[in-house]
Amino acid sequence: DLTRDVCCRLLSTVGLCANEYIEREVDGTLSGGEMKRLEIATVLAKPHKLCIFDEPEAGIDLWSFSMLIEQFEKMYKEKKQSLILISHQERIIQMADRIMVIEGGKIASIGQTADILPQLLGKTADSYSCLKCR
């Protein structure tokens, strides 16, 4: 079980005020950004070897997006977690080791970011799966 102190630290890590969220039922009043940050805190509470995030940047503000990138980097570098990030955001794509491009529901290309990224310039695809793997 998580102690109150651990919960406070996790919420603080993702920029949420613990006093607002601990010992209170979350009743649907959270913004999209707050909900994303709460989801990240939940993942941080019990780290896994592999974490998958589908468009983690959706519905969040610029500050939350920066915090999200920082948390992903920490999860990868410090906690040695592999991440699969499904995103169209250039910043998320650039932080990936490998990219898989999906077009028409099929894999169009997959490989190292340095090899695939130049092919993506000026193009759109159904989705990009960005992989940070160990």
Describe the predicted segments one by one.
Residues 39-40:
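Hydrophobic anchor residue at the start of the ABC signature
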Residues 43-44:
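ABC ATPase C-loop
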Residues 55-56:
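Walker B catalytic motif
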Residues 65-78:
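Helical segment within the ABC ATPase nucleotide-binding domain
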Residues 80-94:
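Conserved H-loop
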Residues 110-111:
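ABC ATPase "signature
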